[in-house]
Amino acid sequence: MDLLLLFVSSIFIHNILLSRFLGCCPFMGVSTKLETARGMGLAVVFVIMLSSLMTWLVYHYVLVPLHLEYLYTLSFILVIAALVQFVELALKKLNPGLYKSLGIFLPLITTNCAVLGVAVINMNENYTLAQSLVNALGSSLGFPLAITLMAGIRERLDQNDAIPKCLRGLPLALVTAGLMSIAFMGFSGMVK
């Protein structure tokens, strides 16, 4: 598969949040403020890229030669957990404000199904290392794109006094996410 096509399709057509519906917990939880959404998006980009590289290497150079392919889920989770710990320590030291604003969602990247999902998609599609990294880059860039758009929309909606009180917060966020998902479905005709 052409790498550019894979890159573009993983951002827009197969968007990890709005098409594959992976990583919805941080999508709803962190998208209330634009700054927090950007920070979470960057952390997820970093973790998805590194975890895709590491899980591809573990799968092809450890699990397959030892005929332990059935342990891929457990080994992928262990790799992701170690990487998230690294990101958490780095953020705590380099940007304490962002570390505090992400709160519980930072350790939850360990169980973010988007991170594990990209690694599993790379394995299931039998991508080469280059294809896996391109898919990981596109998927990981699609995550902050979606979460930043959502945060911007939610901030604007929170400032609107005409919205009924019963729709404010999560109900309107769910409707907004659905509309965003439908909008991203419009990209599906780009690739046959």
Report each predicted region and the residues it spans.
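Generic transmembrane alpha-helix signature in multi-pass membrane proteins
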Residues: F21-G29, E88-L94, I104-L108, C113-N126
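Cytoplasmic-side transmembrane-helix entry/capping segments in multi-pass membrane proteins
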Residues: E35-F46, Y70-F76, L98-I109, K165-P171
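Interfacial loop-to-transmembrane junctions
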Residues: E155-L174
